[in-house]
Every structure is written in C-alpha cells, then in structure tokens.
Amino acid sequence: MEVGWPFFGEVCRALALKVSREYDPEVVLGIAKPGVIPGVVVASILQRDFASMALTRREPGALPQLVAGPPASVRGRRVLLVDETCNSGDTLKLALNEVAALNPKEIRTAVSFRTGPYEPDFYAFETDKLILLPWDREIIEGDQLVLRPEYAHLIEGSR
C-alpha cells in the first residue's frame, strides 16, 4: 500500500485525536528513524515535548538492536512511544523495556499503521498490506532521485 504525504498527514491527525481522547502524555518519544516522523507530527498536534531514541535492524527479519537509548528526561513523566508501523512488536517491546528502565510515570504506545498481531495502545490505520511510506519511496543514486529498487515491483504492480 503506497502512502502519499497528504494521506500520511491525515493518519497522523487521526492518531493524535485517538491519543488525546484517552491519554495525556507529557512527552512524545519517536523511535528513529521512521517513528520520528509521525512522532514529531503527533507531538506538535498535542503540543507536547518531543524526544527520540534509535533502534535498527541490521538485516530484514533480524531482531532490533538499540543504537541510542531514550533521554533521561522521560523519568517520572507520562510517555507516548511512537513508531510508524507495528507487526511483530519486536521494536516496540525493546523500546518499552529501554524506556521502562528510566522509571517513567506511565508509557503507552502508538503507531501510524498496525500491520500484524502485536497490538499497540493506539493505532490510526490497520492493514495486512506492506506499507510504502513517502520518505522510503525514493533514494539518491549519483545525482538523481530514483525509485528505490526493492520497491519498484510493488509500485509498478499496483498500477
């Protein structure tokens, strides 16, 4: 499922509304890289502080690894942990453990797209399709923006 910028904006607005109806975070913590983008948008809409932490998967299917932990400023605060998608929950589980070690007052999770069995506290959209986000669509090769080769067949096949 190819997601354009306008639809992504609507997804972030919907996510912020869902969160605001049930939770009042003091800080929104985005999981870098992809969760930072919806995290910043949600934090801005909710008028809350924003921070980030970084996890990575060295290879597709590998377990995530911590690159940079959450800031100490989450201690004693209500935290909303944001990522862009959630399938297995491996990334959110690792992030939750890292944040919990800093003794926040409360942690809840939010994702733009729920794509699998793991259920975050909040999600804006649910699908079983692969999500192609606008910032993942193109890369630079030489001095040109080109369609990311591993996604070309998905985009061309959907037209």
Residue ranges and their predicted role:
Residues 1-25:
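Active-site-facing substrate-recognition patch
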Residues 97-159:
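PRPP-dependent phosphoribosyltransferase catalytic core
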Residues 21-24, 73-75, 102-103:
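Glycine-rich phosphate-binding loop signature in dinucleotide/nucleotide-binding domains
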Residues 17, 40, 44, 97, ...:
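Short, well-ordered alpha-helices that flank and scaffold nucleotide-derived cofactor binding pockets
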Residues 34:
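Conserved glycine-rich SAM-binding loop
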